[in-house]
Amino acid sequence: MSHFEAVIGLEVHVQLGTKSKLFCSCPTTFGTPPNTNICEICAGMPGALPSLNKLAVEYAVKAGLALHCTINTHSFFSRKNYFYPDLPNGYQISQGTHALCTSGYLDLTIKNNNKRIGIHQIHLENDAGKSIHSPHENKSFIDLNRAGVPLIEIVSKPDINTPSEAVAYLKSLHAIVTYLGISDGNMEEGNFRCDANISLRPYNSKHLGTRTEIKNLNSFRNVQRALEFEINRQQDILEDGKTIIQETRLYNSDKDITTPMRDKETAHDYRYFPDPDLVPIYVTIQEIEKWKGEIPELSDSRQKRFVIEWGLAHQDAEILTSSRELADFFEKAVKLYPKPKKIANLIKILLLHMLNEHNITIQQCTMKPEAIAELAAIIDENLISIKIAHDIFEDLFSKQLMPKDYVIKHGLTQISDTKTIDTIVVEVLAENPTEVAAYKNGKTKLLSFFIGQVMKKMQGQANPALVNQALHNILSK
């Protein structure tokens, strides 16, 4: 058993969904040819003066409001000085010392336990470019398309103690920024990534240990695995009586290890000073109130409402509110056919499975809530069985068809004629005398076998309840 407690703080970088960069009008479009979305400001040319993107300020304030921060009406930008090949100015424009949003929090519920994670600050900054390494040519290339893209950095307090808590915190943050519409949160494109600071200390100690930082973690799985490895690594060092080195490390997902990158910098190393080319940011109380009024219902409160208003299980509500678009889809379907539990099951079992199969998001889905609502209705009307619903869903999904028309056109309506069902049941029992004898001798689980055989003969179109009833009636004679 470990004698140490992990202390974790996360710095989450969220790319804001503005069309232009933070200090110029260059587009932020992902995937364009290298060095096409750049200008003199992106490239750090002498004399090129930045001009602040006001929408980025609005998005940062909305994030601060959603995370219960104090919104500072007066903040300013500083230059964070360090050398890196893809940082053309030789400094990053940030708000490390005088942030727009400070002193917030995020409440989590993890395995029925509530925990509050403090937010130290949220500040605006511009992203760096990208280094592209070509081992075959023994060269490195610089793409400045990303240079100047607007970010907010959400800095937590060191209130996180386990990798699972860290992942829960990140998932909740991800839901918030996507619900707000300030970022698409695309982790594969680097639009939501984090650096993790971690140290160990003896249980019940208030003293913080020497920390290491793990850079650029871009998936929830990588955060979990990297923190688990680093906790074990530091624990082994401390138990051997050795000292933790304060350093920056990288996580290698292929080898599932962290490796040293460089010594860990401190604020003094960056020589922060106010940027002389940018005026301070002034935000009025009226602007703050306006933006506050535009914040939608967020995932946490929506999840609670789904449980109370629609009677859903907590787990189902959590799944359905995992994205704003999915929650909207569910509610639109329920308004059309007010059977929330049935709608929820169809979305969970059929729609989400199909999205995974096609590797697309709900935003890319062409199926309409009307189709799910109608599918639920015709199942309840006994027009089709659940099995038929499963069988036809691929076509409904891929071809944007309405269920009732499809079922009638293809002759797939459920058979509820008792005489027809009785006839097929008698045939099935006659074909399986050994199983019938075993059933009558107490092997009642064979009922499922008989149901399956009847459904097979009737191509899945028989009413399952009537098949069950017919089997019971005939077998009891």
Curated annotation (Swiss-Prot):
Subunit structure: Heterotrimer of A, B and C subunits.
NCBIfam families per UniProt: gatB, PRK05477.1-2, PRK05477.1-4
PROSITE patterns listed in its UniProt record: GATB
Keyword field contains ATP-binding: yes
UniProt keywords, alphabetically: ATP-binding, Ligase, Nucleotide-binding, Protein biosynthesis
Source species, domain of life: Bacteria
Species annotation: Lawsonia intracellularis (strain PHE/MN1-00)
GO molecular function: asparaginyl-tRNA synthase (glutamine-hydrolyzing) activity; ATP binding; glutaminyl-tRNA synthase (glutamine-hydrolyzing) activity
Protein name: Aspartyl/glutamyl-tRNA(Asn/Gln) amidotransferase subunit B
Example GO BP: glutaminyl-tRNAGln biosynthesis via transamidation
Family from the record: Belongs to the GatB/GatE family. GatB subfamily.
